[in-house]
Amino acid sequence: MDSEKSSDAAPAMAESIPREVFRVPAIGDVWVNGLSNEYDASTFPSQLEAYMTQADYDKALDTINQALHDLWPCVPCWSTSYGCCVCTLGLSLYCAWGQVSEAETCTARQIARVNRRACFKDRHITWRLEKSWLKHTSWLVISVVE
């Protein structure tokens, strides 16, 4: 009986795996951890035409980019953090680290709100932020469950 339950659950699990449709590249300033303060909203990718309208895409990206811009460190804080990095053995990076961390947290909240919008939720479209310390970059992933 247990084998019947596991075999029934397997197809349902396979169907609900999201498929990555598009990655929105970072175009703004990048912090040490790879987080960028802006993602490319200049063009609407043709891969997304079957899943969402350009207006929905633009509004979602504006929301995400605005969250990053609002909390991103100011130029003096940013400059001091990087400029004094060698002299302070990296300790100056903590000046802006709190702001970057808060920007990332706020952006995660905004992405959760974007995912709850009817235009995305009803179509099983999800947005998520991914970053790579190794590659020193980040991107937004748009996935869909078909």
Where are the language model's segments positioned?
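A composition-biased, non-transmembrane "mature-region" signal
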Residues: 1-146
